[in-house]
C-alpha cells in the first residue's frame, strides 16, 4: 500500500515538473537560437540574425573592442573620444574578457545563452515566491517572452497580397508583426527588442528581480541581511543598466509608504530603518559609480511631460492594439486578484503606477526608451494574467481549458510569427564587409591605440566599431539617446574635412588621424589639398588615414 502511494506521488511530482522542464527547454532553446545569431562570421563579412541588432550590436562591438584594445577598465568613449564612457559597462566589459580567451562572436554567444538561462531560472524563482505553481511559471514566461498585440492581422493581409503558398510565405515574411511603427505598433517582442539588442537589460533583468525578491523576503521575514544584499546589488546597477536602477527607485518610492502605512505599530520602526539601510547602501555605491562612468549631464533635464508614450493616437486604442487581448484579460484578472489575493494585488500596485507614470512622462531623450521601464510592468502583469488564466481556465474542465488555449494563442500569435521569421533566411543582415574587417585590422596594426580619429558619424563605421579606436564624433543617434550634446563637435568635424581652421581644431581635440574613406567622401566636402600636407597611411584602394598628430605633439607624432 505504501509502495503504491509512493509510486503515485512520484508520478504526480514528475507530472508537475514537466512544466519546469518545458520552461527551460522551450525558452532556453530560444535563447540558444538567438545567441548564435548575435554575430555571424561569414567569408564576406559579419552578419546579425535580427534587424534590431543591426544598430545596437555595432554600438556594443565598439565598447567590446575598445576594452579589448585599450586594456583599460575605464577607457574613453569609442563614439565620443576623450570623454567618459557614459554607458553601463558590465555587459560589454564581461564579454570583452571572454573574447580575450576566445573570440568576440563566441563571447557574444556564450554570454547571451548563459545569461538567458539565468533569466529563466531567476524569473522562475521570483514567480514561485508569490504563486507556487510551475504551470503558472510556464504560462507567465510564455506570455512574457511572446508578448504581442493585434499586429498579426497584417500577417493575413500580407499573405493575401503575396500570391504565394502558405509555406513559401511563412519562409519569406516581409514584416515583423509586433513592430509596425508606421501603424502604431510599438510593443515589440521582448526577445527582439530587449533581451538581444539591449545587452545591459539582459544582464540587469535577473539582478533586478533578485533585488525585488530579496526586499520582499527581507521585509516579510524581518531578515536584515537580505535588505543589505539588496542594497549592495542595487548600488552596482549603474554598471549594468541605468533604467533598472530607476525601476528599483520607483518601486521603492511607491512601496515604502505602503509598507509603513499597513504595518503594525511594533514593526513600523524596523521597517523604516530597513528601508533607510537599503536606500543608504544604494546611494553610497551608485552615486560614485554614476559620477565615474557618466558625463556631467543632469538627468532631470530630460524629464518632460509627454502623454501616451509613443502613441500618436488615442491612448486606449494604442494600448488596446499593442497589447491585444492581453489588455482586457489583465483588467479582469486584476479585479479577480483583488478579490481573491489582496496581498498579490498590493505587490502589483507599484508596477501599475510605473505603467501610468511611463505613459505621462518621458525620462530620457528618446521616448521609446520608457519601454525599459514598461517591460518590467509587463512582466509583473504577465504573472497576474497567468495566475488568473490558470485558476479560471486551466484548473477547470475541458471547455475552460480549450477556451484558455485559444486566448493564449491569440495573445502570443504575433510574437510567434516574429520569432519564427528569425529562423528563415530573410533575417540575415550584413553589418560589416570583408573590406571593413581588413580596414579595422590594418588600423589596429598601423596606429596608436590611444589615438583619436575623425570619421564619418555613421552607425557601422569599421574604425570605432572593430578596431577599438575612438572617433571624435560617432553616430549621432547614439549620442542623442545617451544625452550627449555633440552639435559643436559635429560642426568642427565638418570644418576639419573642409580644411577650415584646421590646425587649431586638430590641436584643440588632440586628433591623431583623419580618416578618408567611402563614408567620409559621401558625408563631407573634403579638402584633399590640405590633407596632402600630412603623412598618408594607405589602408586600401578606398581608404586612407592622415597622421596629423605632429600638429599638436611638437614633432613627436603618434604613428
Predicted regions and their residues:
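Membrane-interface helix-loop-helix junctions at transmembrane boundaries of multi-pass membrane enzymes
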Residues: 10-18, 217-226, 261-276, 332-352, ...
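Hydrophobic alpha-helical membrane-interfacial segments at the cytosolic entry of transmembrane helices
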Residues: 15, 19-26, 139-143, 232, ...
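Active-site lumenal/periplasmic loops and adjacent helix-entry segments of GT-C-fold
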Residues: 26-207, 242-243, 430, 457
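Transmembrane-lumen/periplasm boundary regions of multi-pass, lipid-linked membrane glycan transferases
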Residues: 55-56, 60-63, 68-69, 257, ...
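Hydrophobic/aromatic-rich transmembrane helices and adjacent perimembrane loops
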Residues: 113-116, 201, 246-249, 366-392
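Membrane-interface alpha helices of multi-pass inner-membrane proteins
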Residues: 192-195, 226-241
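Hydrophobic, aromatic-rich transmembrane alpha-helices
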Residues: 210-218, 250-262, 323-345, 388-391
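Extracytoplasmic
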Residues: 393-559
Amino acid at each position: 500500500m505504501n509502495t503504491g502511494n509512493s509510486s503515485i506521488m512520484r508520478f504526480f511530482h514528475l507530472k508537475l515538473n514537466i512544466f519546469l522542464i518545458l520552461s527551460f527547454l522551450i525558452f532556453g532553446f530560444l535563447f540558444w537560437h538567438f545567441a548564435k545569431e548575435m554575430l555571424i562570421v561569414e567569408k564576406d563579412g559579419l552578419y546579425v540574425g535580427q534587424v534590431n541588432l543591426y544598430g545596437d550590436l555595432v554600438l556594443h562591438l565598439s565598447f567590446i573592442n575598445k576594452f579589448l584594445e585599450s586594456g583599460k577598465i575605464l577607457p574613453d568613449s569609442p563614439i565620443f573620444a576623450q570623454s567618459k564612457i557614459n554607458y553601463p559597462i558590465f555587459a560589454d566589459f564581461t564579454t570583452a574578457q571572454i573574447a580575450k580567451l576566445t573570440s568576440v562572436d563566441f563571447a557574444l554567444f556564450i554570454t547571451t545563452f548563459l545569461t538567458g538561462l539565468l533569466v529563466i531560472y531567476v524569473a522562475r524563482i521570483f514567480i514561485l515566491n508569490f504563486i507556487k505553481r510551475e504551470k503558472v511559471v510556464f504560462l507567465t514566461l510564455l506570455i512574457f517572452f511572446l508578448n504581442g498585440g493585434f499586429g498579426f492581422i497584417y500577417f493575413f493581409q500580407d499573405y493575401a497580397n503575396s500570391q504565394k503558398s502558405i509555406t513559401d510565405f511563412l519562409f519569406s515574411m516581409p514584416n515583423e508583426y509586433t513592430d509596425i511603427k508606421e501603424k502604431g505598433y510599438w510593443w515589440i517582442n521582448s526577445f527582439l527588442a530587449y533581451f538581444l539588442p539591449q545587452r545591459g537589460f539582459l544582464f540587469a533583468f535577473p539582478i533586478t528581480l533578485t533585488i525585488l525578491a530579496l526586499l520582499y523576503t527581507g521585509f516579510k521575514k524581518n531578515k536584515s541581511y537580505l535588505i543589505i544584499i539588496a542594497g549592495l546589488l542595487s548600488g552596482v546597477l549603474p554598471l549594468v543598466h541605468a533604467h533598472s536602477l530607476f525601476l528599483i527607485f520607483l518601486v521603492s518610492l511607491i512601496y515604502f509608504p505602503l509598507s509603513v502605512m499597513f504595518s503594525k505599530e511594533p514593526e513600523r520602526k524596523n521597517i523604516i530603518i530597513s528601508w533607510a539601510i537599503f536606500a543608504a547602501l544604494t546611494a553610497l555605491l551608485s552615486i560614485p559609480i554614476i559620477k565615474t562612468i557618466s558625463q556631467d549631464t543632469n538627468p532631470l533635464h530630460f524629464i518632460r511631460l509627454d502623454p501616451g508614450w509613443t502613441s500618436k493616437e488615442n491612448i486606449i486604442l494604442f494600448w488596446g492594439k499593442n497589447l491585444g487581448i492581453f489588455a482586457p484579460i489583465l483588467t479582469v484578472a486584476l479585479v479577480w486578484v483583488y478579490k481573491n489575493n489582496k496581498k498579490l494585488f498590493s505587490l502589483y500596485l507599484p508596477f501599475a503606477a510605473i505603467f501610468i507614470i511611463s505613459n505621462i512622462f518621458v525620462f530620457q531623450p528618446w521616448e521609446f526608451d520608457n519601454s525599459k521601464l514598461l517591460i518590467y510592468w509587463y512582466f509583473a502583469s504577465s504573472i497576474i494574467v497567468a495566475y488568473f488564466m490558470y485558476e479560471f481556465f486551466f484548473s477547470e474542465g475541458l471547455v475552460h481549458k480549450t477556451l484558455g488555449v485559444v486566448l493564449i494563442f491569440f495573445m502570443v500569435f504575433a510574437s510567434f510569427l516574429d520569432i519564427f521569421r528569425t529562423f528563415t533566411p530573410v533575417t540575415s543582415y550584413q553589418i560589416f564587409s570583408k573590406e571593413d574587417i581588413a580596414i579595422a585590422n590594418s588600423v589596429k596594426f598601423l596606429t596608436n591605440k590611444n589615438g583619436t580619429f575623425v570619421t564619418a558619424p555613421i552607425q557601422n563605421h569599421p574604425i570605432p566599431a572593430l578596431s577599438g579606436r575612438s572617433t571624435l564624433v560617432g553616430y549621432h543617434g547614439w549620442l542623442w539617446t545617451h544625452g550627449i550634446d555633440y552639435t559643436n563637435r559635429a560642426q568642427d568635424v565638418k570644418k576639419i574635412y573642409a580644411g577650415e581652421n584646421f590646425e587649431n581644431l586638430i590641436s584643440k581635440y588632440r586628433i591623431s588621424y583623419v580618416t578618408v574613406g567611402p563614408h567620409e567622401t559621401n558625408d563631407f566636402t573634403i579638402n584633399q589639398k590640405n590633407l596632402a600636407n600630412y603623412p598618408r597611411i594607405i589602408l586600401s584602394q578606398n581608404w586612407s588615414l592622415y597622421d596629423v598628430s605632429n600638429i599638436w605633439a611638437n614633432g613627436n607624432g603618434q604613428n
